[in-house]
Design a protein with these regions (language model features):
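Catalytic core of carbohydrate-active enzymes
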Residues: 462-466, 470-473, 480-491, 504-508, ...
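Conserved, mostly hydrophobic/aromatic
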Residues: 42, 196, 291, 331, ...
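Short, well-ordered beta-strand segments enriched in hydrophobic/aromatic residues
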Residues: 42, 52, 88-93, 629-632, ...
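Aromatic- and carboxylate-enriched substrate-binding clefts and catalytic-loop regions
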Residues: 4, 55-57, 64-67, 297-573, ...
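Catalytic domains of carbohydrate-active enzymes, especially glycoside hydrolases
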Residues: 283-303
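A low-complexity, Ser/Thr/Gly/Pro-enriched, surface-exposed linker/loop concept
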Residues: 2-24, 28, 43-85
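Solvent-exposed beta-strand/loop surfaces of large extracellular or lumenal domains
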Residues: 62-77, 653-671, 775-797
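Catalytic and substrate-binding clefts that recognize carbohydrates or anionic sugar/phosphate headgroups
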Residues: 34-35, 55, 76-265, 275-276, ...
Length: 810
């Protein structure tokens, strides 16, 4: 294990909380107080969003951050009250209370609920570090923030964590690393850092984003069960409080601040296949044939580092891939896209134009002595781009032309923590300098380490937009910081082909979802080590419900394409991937919701049921949207597992068995039939069977419903699947509801919003569990059902933009 993993904060001094404060300025949005030479600002950005900044002596307030996307907030109605003991800053939704002696800050909503209140004893402040290196002065002193834990407060979030949903009683480290292959759930910091806590107290939620890109640590009621601690090794204290009170409102406002997930190209939601590495053109063609001949849907094939010339980025190995343009064109005709890996390390080679151009333009990181910083990764000795420099990002993005001109559809950013090969130095040393270019100030690597991956992903996305302005970019990143979701989807790095890692994937993706990163996925089947048929099949049963579905494994392991282990596993993988392909209309509609509101796609049960404390520990089951509940098998040789179904009526997808929640059940989940449940009366839009997203079968869209007494709703969203016409209204969005009484069922398709017109002519309603019907009307006119068989009533409707009402007399 490298020194980076074991590193603990060394303050070398004493913590000093801020003392007596005095008001010295205020405006129509916030107030400023001074404690000696330190300035503290409290600002209302929105009725339910406050920002607090603590800036040391001589430091002007600065809030620019790679983690923040929105800086221009609309007018907020704010009132300030002042007394000798306290200042209050109130909006229509919440109040910030600023006690002056000593300075302590807390928040309360309009109902009086208190949250994010400073610890009375420790508050916030800094650690004096005498004898600091002059070169390190820009880093500043370590800073600390202590918050009181409310009675019953439970902590969640914290980004990419694998050890479970709840974080109460834990210590969290935020420092991006390339962890050792085979890490377990107890391993703390991984590839990305999102210093955001999501708290629930008595069913009410709030969030706290500690926006500091140095190494950060949280203690969430571990050392002291009555307080939480947020600290960084340098910089200022800047944090944002999201008042809630629902999880949906917290995540909505958090992603408004840090950035929404862009609408993806539709093809990126299809099944994807990767290996480190498909070594040459013929091997790639063989894999493509395997999918099409076996009838297993697939949209994307990846090229790992062996497509390059000596691992040099933005090159092709002419021996392995003599004509990449022709290969990619041929694959495109078969319905495949190709995505290529790109690492940040640039080989130091005088005969390599990418390296020499970057050197001539002074675009690389430096040593503290001003020399070009070098270290070792895949190509050997490398230089590392300074992605804090806008000129570097533009140059990097333009270099992608070598790939896009050959037809490459997306960029896979790897090794961007950044990871290094030299023993005991797993990433750039703290004193490496990022010059920042002509428009930026130089920064030490310690100041920006956690943002390096996000900045690389930003360069990739901006480059693709410049090279192909009419296409939605597809960028994958392994590393990043809060807000990475606006640049790329987050692949969670090198897992292992272990049952434990299958289980760890579920809390990992749910934690990311609560932290704003909804578009994420793990390697299906596991990356490190040999998988087996049962593990691959069970992992596929889980993987097809991820927002990102990709099978990937490392060099030297057994092949793990869906057919690698023969029957019955090939058939299980085929049918599960076919189910994902059919669910794409539902999945794409969830991406629309996520793009507009930040709502997670794969979400923990507590997101929808925060007042149900049983959901707080439901680590190994999850919701896809609010309609499907998935509970995968995560142990070998078993067919039964415990499932918790929250409030409402739920139906087993395969058998139609009905359950009234909240209820604990023992679910039967034989291989090929995972524990999958559908919320009653909630329509699921499903497409026809297809080999890839570009295939357009004649079969109509199906709205699948398991009717149950009461009312359920969902949304169907469609657009061209690529391009940016949807931003100009070229989309089709409609609400669909189902309402059931004792003898009556009503399906309503709301008016189609937007100017996009779907190509299909028909929509099919499939009402499962309906065995008899006395009559069917469509907009008050009698309508003969297609059939009542197999435990389902099927009704075919014309595709119309106007509202449609279907009545079924039971």
């Amino acid at each position: 294990m490298s020194e980076t993993f074991e590193k603990q904060p060394e303050t070398g001094g004493d913590y000093e909380p801020l003392g007596v404060a005095e008001l010295f300025d205020h405006d129509d949005r916030g107030l400023r107080v001074r404690v000696g030479a330190t300035t503290v600002e409290v600002t209302a950005l929105a009725p339910d969003l406050f920002r607090v900044g603590m800036f040391p002596a001589g430091g002007p307030p600065r809030y620019d951050s790679e983690g923040v996307a929105k800086e221009d907030w609309g007018t907020v109605e704010v009132s300030m009250q002042e007394s000798d003991e306290e200042l209050t800053l109130s909006t229509t939704a919440a109040t910030a209370r600023v006690a002056l002696n000593p300075l302590r800050i807390g928040f309360a909503d309009s109902s009086g609920r208190e949250f994010a209140v400073d610890d009375e004893e420790l508050g916030m402040g800094s650690v004096e570090t005498p004898g600091a290196d002059v070169f390190s002065e820009p880093l500043g002193s370590p800073v600390r923030l202590y918050k009181r834990r409310e009675a019953g407060e439970r902590y969640f979030g914290c980004g990419e964590r694998t050890s479970g949903l709840e974080k109460t009683g834990s210590h969290q480290v935020f420092y991006n690393v390339d962890p050792p292959l085979g890490h377990t759930a107890s391993f703390n910091n991984l590839y990305s850092s999102i210093p955001f806590t999501f708290s629930i107290t008595n069913g009410k939620a709030h969030g706290l984003f500690f926006d500091n890109t140095h190494r950060v640590e949280f203690d969430l009621a571990l050392e002291d069960e009555n307080r939480a601690y947020y600290g960084a090794e340098g910089g200022a204290i800047v944090y944002y409080v999201f008042c809630g009170p629902t999880p949906r409102e917290v995540v909505d406002r958090y992603t408004e601040l840090t950035g929404r997930t862009p609408m993806p190209p539709l093809w990126t939601l299809g099944n994807q296949q990767c290996r480190y590495s498909y070594m040459n053109e013929e091997e790639v063609r063989e894999v493509a044939r395997g999918f099409r001949e076996r009838g297993i849907p697939c949209d994307v094939i990846y090229l790992d580092i062996h497509y390059m010339d000596g691992y040099r980025v933005f090159t092709w190995n002419e021996d392995r891939f003599p004509n990449p343009r022709r290969l990619i064109s041929d694959l495109r005709e078969q319905g495949f896209r190709v995505v290529t890996i790109v690492d940040p390390g640039v080989k130091v080679d005088e005969n390599y134009s990418v390296y020499t151009e970057g050197r001539e333009r002074d675009l690389y990181c430096k040593t503290r002595e001003g020399e070009e910083y070098h270290n070792v990764v895949w190509p050997g000795v490398c230089a590392f781009p300074d992605f804090t420099n806008p000129e570097t990002r533009g140059w990097w993005g333009e270099n992608q032309r070598v790939l896009t001109d050959a037809g490459v559809a997306g960029i896979w950013c790897d090794m961007n923590e950044p990871a290094l090969f030299i023993p005991h130095v797993s990433t750039l040393p703290d004193d490496v300098v990022h010059p920042g270019g002509r428009t930026g100030a130089p920064k030490r690597h310690a100041q920006i380490h956690n943002t390096y991956g996000s900045l690389m992903a930003r360069a990739a996305r901006e480059g693709l937009l410049a090279l192909r302005p009419d296409e939605r970019p597809f960028v994958i990143t392994r590393a990043g910081y809060a807000g990475l979701q606006r640049h790329a989807m987050h692949w969670t790095g090198d897992n292992s082909s272990w049952w434990e890692h299958l289980w760890m994937s579920m809390p990992q993706l749910q934690n990311l979802a609560l932290s704003g990163v909804a578009w994420a996925g793990v390697d299906v089947g596991g990356f490190g080590g040999d998988t087996n048929g049962e593990l691959l099949a069970r992992w596929t049963e889980f993987g097809v419900f991820q927002p990102y579905c990709r099978n990937h494994t490392t060099i030297g392991t057994r092949r793990q394409e869906p057919w690698a282990f023969g029957e019955p596993y090939e058939s299980v993988c085929r049918e599960m991937i076919k189910l994902r392909q059919r669910l794409l209309p539902y999945l794409y509609s969830l991406f629309d919701e996520c793009h507009r509101t930040g709502a997670p796609i794969l979400r923990p049960l507590l997101f929808e049921y925060p007042e149900d404390e049983t959901t707080y520990t439901a680590d190994d089951e999850f919701l896809l949207g609010d309609v499907l509940l998935v509970a995968p098998i995560t142990r070998p040789g078993i067919e039964y597992r415990h499932v918790y179904l929250p409030e409402g009526t739920w139906f087993h997808y395969y058998s139609g068995e009905r359950f009234e929640g909240p209820v604990h059940i023992l679910a039967h989940a034989p291989l090929g039939e995972p524990a999958l449940y559908v919320r009653g009366s909630s329509p699921i839009p499903m497409g026809p069977h297809a080999a890839h997203t570009g295939e357009r079968p004649d079969d109509p869209l199906t709205l699948l419903v398991y009717p149950a007494k009461g009312k359920g709703e969902s949304t169907l969203y469609e657009d061209a699947g690529n391009g940016f016409g949807y931003e100009e209204g070229e989309y089709a969005r409609r609400r669909i509801s189902c309402e059931v009484s004792d003898d009556h069922l009503t399906i309503r398709l709301g008016e189609r919003q937007g100017s996009f017109v779907p190509e299909r002519q028909e929509i099919r309603l499939e009402l499962r569990g309906i065995t008899t019907a006395q009559g069917v009307t469509v907009n008050d006119e009698e309508h003969a059902p297609d059939r009542v068989e197999g435990g389902a009533l099927t009704v075919t409707l014309g595709e119309e933009a106007t509202p449609t009402r279907v009545e079924v007399i039971l």
